[in-house]
């Protein structure tokens, strides 16, 4: 819904929505000249070939790069001669991605862009996003594949039931939840389990344990550990999936 409102495909119920200092609804035609879009529910012309479809989409946008298109076709290994109706879900997705990535614009608006792609094609997509970032292009990526967002995003917005519940860099969001600690010491590790700031305690043997700790308690832990002879200390920051799930569980 948010993406559709930004593109002027839906009218907002209240508030202000603008892109490039232009009203998303009133100035949508002007905004579209600066935006490439891959929808989550990609619908194409069944009787056109893949090549014809890409050419048409690029022509409609008006700022396509033929050389870049050919490069992307080769990278994504797409047969342009086949009709769209014969394409798999993944190949249909490639059509949309090639058409969007082959145009030069200021904002690339991608809604579930890797749906249907195999891991190799996902890797190629990620390389293309890295290229756009180097060119200082803006990319808005909507995805339920949190590992993908974690690899690609500079800033993350978590939306739940239509409202923004968290927003910031991944590093900023990690401060909101717990890190996982793997600890091995030469002396007995058990006394640590009784500390009030230690959670999810799992003892491997008398010298090793795994547990979690809030960001604000990290200094307390390090102070306590000065009394131990440490053989191994591994601190794993939370993944985006862990951040999301913990926030969801707290809300429930």
PLM ranges: what are they?
Residues 179-251:
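Short, charged/small-residue-rich alpha-helical element at the C-terminal edge
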Residues 119-121:
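Helix N-cap at the start of a conserved alpha-helix in ABC-type nucleotide-binding domains
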Residues 7:
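Helix-to-loop junction immediately C-terminal to a conserved catalytic motif
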Residues 108-112:
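Catalytic Walker B motif of ABC-type/P-loop ATPase nucleotide-binding domains
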Residues 125-212:
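ABC transporter nucleotide-binding domain
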Residues 15-26, 30-31:
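Conserved ABC transporter NBD signature motif
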């Amino acid at each position: 819904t948010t993406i559709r409102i930004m593109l002027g495909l839906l009218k907002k119920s209240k508030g202000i929505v603008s892109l490039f200092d232009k009203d998303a609804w009133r100035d949508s035609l002007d905004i579209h000249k600066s935006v490439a879009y891959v929808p989550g529910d990609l619908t194409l012309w069944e009787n056109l070939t893949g090549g014809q479809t890409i050419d048409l989409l690029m022509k409609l946008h008006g700022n396509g790069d033929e050389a870049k298109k050919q490069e992307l076709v080769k990278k994504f290994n797409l047969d342009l001669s086949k009709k769209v109706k014969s394409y798999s879900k993944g190949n249909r997705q490639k059509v949309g991605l090639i058409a969007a990535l082959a145009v030069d614009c200021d904002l690339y608006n991608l809604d579930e862009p890797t749906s249907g792609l195999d891991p190799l094609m996902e890797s190629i997509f990620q390389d293309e996003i890295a290229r756009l970032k180097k060119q200082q292009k803006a990319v808005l990526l909507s995805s339920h594949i949190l590992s993908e967002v974690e690899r690609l995003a500079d800033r993350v917005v978590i939306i739940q039931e239509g409202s923004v519940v968290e927003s910031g860099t991944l590093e900023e969001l990690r401060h909101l939840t717990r890190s996982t600690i793997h600890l091995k010491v030469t002396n007995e590790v058990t006394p640590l389990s009784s500390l009030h700031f230690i959670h999810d305690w799992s003892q491997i043997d008398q010298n090793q344990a795994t547990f979690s700790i809030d960001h604000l308690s990290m200094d307390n832990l390090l102070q306590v550990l000065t009394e131990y002879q440490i053989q191994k200390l591994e601190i794993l920051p939370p993944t985006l999936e862990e951040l999301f799930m913990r926030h969801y569980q707290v809300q429930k």
